[in-house]
Design a protein with these regions (language model features):
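Gly/Pro- and small hydrophobic-enriched strand-loop and loop-to-helix capping segments
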Residues: 62-64, 126-139
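Active-site/ligand-binding-proximal alpha/beta "capping" segment
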Residues: 92-127, 134, 185-193
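Short acidic/polar capping segments at secondary-structure boundaries
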Residues: 110-112, 126-128, 139-141, 172-173
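Flexible, glycine/proline-enriched loop segments at strand-loop-helix junctions
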Residues: 107-108, 132-136, 163-166
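A cross-family phosphate/adenosyl-ligand binding-site feature
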Residues: 1-100, 139-178, 182-195
Length: 195
């Protein structure tokens, strides 16, 4: 029997300047729960992290939180996760999150979100995994970043095929459905232990 779709969501520990960000984070969580899926995320209880986790739990989904000891108090760890893993380092956090996921999805966030997105994108281009990566461009948040990335292509530092590794969308259900289809929903056996 195939396991449920497990998606690693990267997003802000803040809600951002517009309510649309939290609304879309909750839509992501509701989709995961309604599809008997599993959220893997950074284990926080605030901002978009808290919104997506709450909505997943309220909709019947599983929530796997992974948080370093040093951030437990700072990010107000979500103690009612289905599973909450307190790890030693950020590297341990990212490795466990990657291992537990069938796909990755970046919602709006700050430099931590950017770093996580770029890391799994780099791993994908290098062949460390073949899991799909989505970018939810809520309220045009990622528009300037996408323009910059196209500039990098135009200047010869990236190729179009690298851009093609990202699934970009503004509608949570459509993007999540595409990621689930592309992932094989639990069939990937990538090993992140040597990264």
């Amino acid at each position: 029997m195939k396991q449920a779709f497990s998606v690693c969501v990267y997003c802000g520990s803040r809600t951002g300047a517009t309510p649309e960000f939290a609304t879309l984070a909750r839509e992501v969580g509701r989709w995961i729960g309604a599809n008997d899926g599993q959220l893997v995320y950074g284990g926080g209880n605030t901002g978009l992290m808290g919104a997506v986790a709450d909505a997943t739990l309220e909709s019947g989904g599983r929530v796997v939180g992974v948080i370093p000891k040093a951030l437990v108090e700072r990010e107000f760890a979500k103690l009612d996760c289905t599973e909450l893993h307190v790890v030693d380092t950020m590297h341990d956090r990212k490795q466990m999150m990657a291992e537990r996921a069938d796909a990755f999805l970046a919602l709006p966030g700050g430099i931590g979100t950017f770093e996580e997105l770029f890391e799994v994108w780099t791993w994908r281009q290098l062949g460390y995994h073949d899991k799909p990566i989505g970018l939810l461009d809520a309220a045009g948040y990622y528009g300037p970043l996408l323009a910059f990335l196209q500039s990098s292509v135009a200047h010869g530092f990236m190729n179009e095929w690298q851009m093609g590794l990202l699934r970009i969308g503004s509608e949570p259900a459509t993007l999540l459905s595409q990621l689930a289809r592309d992932s094989g929903a639990g069939t990937d056996e990538s090993d992140f232990s040597d990264i």
